[in-house]
């Protein structure tokens, strides 16, 4: 929340940790004048900083405005592994604090650590305990483990000014991030998934699908499922090739061709995925968080209403679907963010947190 000290804290973290573990400090004004970014055509003000702790290297995002966080999280390719919620001890939780926690819940931030800022300005221990209790209650309301959530008491400004007592609290915060937020699973260790981009028949050998392996590893001889658009089917991978070379396996990040046993060219199409059996399911109806582009961002000039039928672009393909709006919402204006329920005309392989774009006549909405 504005003036609770998010940006000062970001500057303090980079400064204190650079002193202790190396790396570069970032001044407040370097972070505060967040450059405008164009992510998928959406204008977002955001500052990216990086820092090292004793155990890890962190990438950290600081956004000036609430709307910027929403846009950042909806469009961001990177999943947030955790968040630092900054609350000023002098004010306690404000309406924006609740919004930030709700936002974390909506976009699937798995872990929150609380930094209670400006504690140098509060002498009253009981007041600090009261603020902590209020924050814990709020977290619990939104299904975060309020009782277990670590709360670090500190002063970002004093730490930034080099006061050793408060610098130590920044180190405490860093240690807490290391211990409380689990190390995310690398994409190579996750179950195999390949969004299909193209399908070929190779006479005498069968059908080859091509695409970039999104996660995991596919080995020759393994069983795979073909999921989405049609009824889910199973087959065996009989070959993997990359740049015309035959390989034993295809790994996350690689563009490969996968040869499939006994699968006909017409059984399979772009927009389906190849996956490790049982790891992803097809769905027609889903709940989503959507940011609607403003006119300036190249979006619509007019609102849309329930029953709107655009195209929904998932991974490699467009599918038509229709929109249901929340109760009491009549229309959606360009620039809004909205929770909507969508029903597609074909099933698509989906899991929680999957990103998609809404398009109309070839342009993004």
From Swiss-Prot:
SUPFAM superfamilies: EF-Tu/eEF-1alpha/eIF2-gamma C-terminal domain, P-loop containing nucleoside triphosphate hydrolases, Translation proteins. GO terms for cellular component: cytosol. Its EC number is 3.6.5.3. It is found in: Cytoplasm. Keywords: Cytoplasm, Elongation factor, GTP-binding, Hydrolase, Magnesium, Metal-binding, Nucleotide-binding, Protein biosynthesis. Residues 1-185 form the tr-type G domain. InterPro entries: EF-Tu_GTP-bd, EF-Tu_GTPase, EFTu-like_2, EFTU_2, G_TR_CS, P-loop_NTPase, T_Tr_GTP-bd_dom, Transl_B-barrel_sf. GTP binds at residues 1-7, 62-66, 117-120. Its main location: cytoplasm. One of its GO terms (molecular function) is GTPase activity. It catalyses: GTP + H2O = GDP + phosphate + H(+). Mg(2+) binds at residue 7. It is an enzyme of class 3 (hydrolase). PANTHER family: ELONGATION FACTOR TU, MITOCHONDRIAL (PTHR43721:SF22), ELONGATION FACTOR TU-RELATED (PTHR43721). GTP hydrolase that promotes the GTP-dependent binding of aminoacyl-tRNA to the A-site of ribosomes during protein biosynthesis. Monomer. Belongs to the TRAFAC class translation factor GTPase superfamily. Classic translation factor GTPase family. EF-Tu/EF-1A subfamily. This is Elongation factor Tu. It comes from Buchnera aphidicola subsp. Schlechtendalia chinensis.
